[in-house]
Amino acid sequence: MAIPKIVLFYQFTPLADPEAIKLWQHSLAESNNLTGRIIVSPHGINATVGGDIEDVKRYVRGTRGYEPFRTADIKWSDGLGNDFPRLSVKARSEIVTFGAPDELKVDENGVVGGGVHLAPKELHELVDSRGDDVVFFDGRNAFEAEIGRFRDAVVPDVATTRDFVDELDSGKYDHLKGKAVVTYCTGGVRCEVLSSLMRSRGFDEVYQLDGGIVRYGETFGDRGLWDGSLYVFDKRMNIEFSSEAKTLGVCVDCGTPTPRYRNRIDGDGRTLELLCESCSPDLEQD
């Protein structure tokens, strides 16, 4: 019986030949019948792939067999079996598109000059000891935070990751430079870059949630500082860490609380919107 699983991971490490790594990763994933997205750059790898559990395990073993990726933190979750339409493996200038490839420096230990990594329990210790001096800073697109976020988090008004550089350079967050700023994102990769960009712009005390929201949810579920659902970039669209998850999103049509993002198809194409089951019962999620 097939057991669908999804793995999410990244590794910041210098790669001399991203094109060669791309070809190898495509062959490895394809030979194991996986679908999903893999991005390779001179800075490392960022991947989310899914398939049957045994196929995924073989892919993970093969990937970790390459020394620079040996310590990759693999995050597992349950899949649906058709979570991605195809396999996409690309070589780019960045594994997360902030539009600032020349600002990021990496070595064999990861990002140079990034924020201090905090495990979920260490995050709670920081909040307990520093109180209101700690500020959560969302490293995702603003729409993701509409269905879930850390309590009282700062949510930058960004539509894409590329918007963060201008957002930081605008000066609107300069009042946080004397605070303990904790960046967070889905699995951690965006905050690796964001925290380094913030530090280079004068934010002295910057942290990043190690393993991202995914690892935090695995540790504390809905009994901690996280409220709501987690947006994910596959056909699931959102996941919850327990049956006790709060519903923060609101249907744009009727105002019913909902965590469901769906593609509304109209004359202008597709628009991702919060739509409850009553208002979008039969929308196809391609």
Swiss-Prot record:
This is tRNA uridine(34) hydroxylase. One of its GO terms (molecular function) is oxidoreductase activity, acting on paired donors, with incorporation or reduction of molecular oxygen. The gene is trhO. Its EC number is 1.14.-.-. The lineage of its organism: Bacteria, Bacillati, Actinomycetota, Actinomycetes, Mycobacteriales. Belongs to the TrhO family. One of its GO terms (biological process) is tRNA modification. It catalyses: uridine(34) in tRNA + AH2 + O2 = 5-hydroxyuridine(34) in tRNA + A + H2O. SMART domains: RHOD. Coiled coil: none annotated. The keyword tRNA processing applies. HAMAP family: TrhO (MF_00469). It is an enzyme of class 1 (oxidoreductase). SUPFAM superfamilies: Rhodanese/Cell cycle control phosphatase (SSF52821). Catalyzes oxygen-dependent 5-hydroxyuridine (ho5U) modification at position 34 in tRNAs. Gene3D superfamilies: 3.30.70.100, Rhodanese-like domain (3.40.250.10).
